[in-house]
Amino acid sequence: MPPPTAQLLGWELIDVDVEQGTIRIAFHPDERMLNPRGTVQGGIVAAMLDDTMVPALYALTGGQYLASTIDLNVSFIRPVQPGRVIAEGRVVNRGRSVVFMEAELLSEDGKLLARATSSGIPIELAK
């Protein structure tokens, strides 16, 4: 289930709630992902959040659907430091032609680092 970017981002599945369409993932950003200030570059943070929301749809549909992201909005709340961070993603609403998702990125001690909302086109996977 992990997307191809999983290895780069240090993707680690924590848990999935299929009925609720939620997922928790740990990421492990390292020094390759830092900006000149020594914090994780914003595009990497956005990728982590995107790589949390789409697997939430996959979980909700029992592995039948992924989403092609058509809109991604990220709010950067606090700088993300290298090391383990936790992302929580969920499907907010699933329609036939568009799915709406959201995710939060948290420090290990539970501080909100970033939040994202996304819409995507559901794509049925080959059976």
Task: Name these PLM-found stretches.
Residues M1-K127:
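Terminal targeting signals and extreme-terminal segments of soluble enzymes
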